[in-house]
Amino acid sequence: MAYEFIKFEVKDHVAYITLNNPQKKNPVPNPAKKELIRLFDICDFDDDIRLVVIRGAGGCFSAGGDLNAMRDRLERGERGTRYNCRLGSEMNLRLRNVKKPVIACIEGAIAGAGMSLALSCDFQIAAADTKCTLAFVNIGYVPDSGATWLVTKAVGQVRATELFMSGKRFSGQQAADWGLFTEAVPPEQLEERLAKYIDK
């Protein structure tokens, strides 16, 4: 089956889900969320799949929500915004319930809804120089897609509040040091480290 926003392939019992809109830094608009929910179902119930890897095309994990689509929803009124929040939460809850290990392979940049997606995985392996932000406050948006729970659970209330309220940028290495990511490695070692996780 062909997907508009996602590249999907299975090789040696590993499912590779790649956010595939590199020209826009792999945003996660609502149609992409629907595709991801469908793929998480496939990964969960296909006995040939033993492990799932999620990453972004073009050297960037995900810039988060599609700002143009978000602006259009706001112009349509509150109902569109509520639907967006609900769909993001549904996507990440479905991901968290996949009964196989899921690895987020993070590089380039990650923000907003992309961060929520990565934190819903079992493991987060990041390039140490990844540019990270929770960004919601910078666009006047409330953290959605389970972000408030996921981030607070990972780093505690004090640091989570700082990150949400400041919208500051931090590196993949800092994220790993805080416990937000599983680990960070030099960028040139990312593929090798991912391969070791897969081999386990």
Region locations from a protein language model:
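Histidine-centered beta-alpha loop that forms part of the nucleotide-sugar donor binding/catalytic region
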Residues: 20, 65, 107
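Hydrophobic/aromatic residues within transmembrane alpha-helices
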Residues: 17, 54, 66, 117-118, ...
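Conserved CoA-thioester-binding segment of acyl-CoA-metabolizing enzymes
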Residues: 1-57, 93, 191, 197
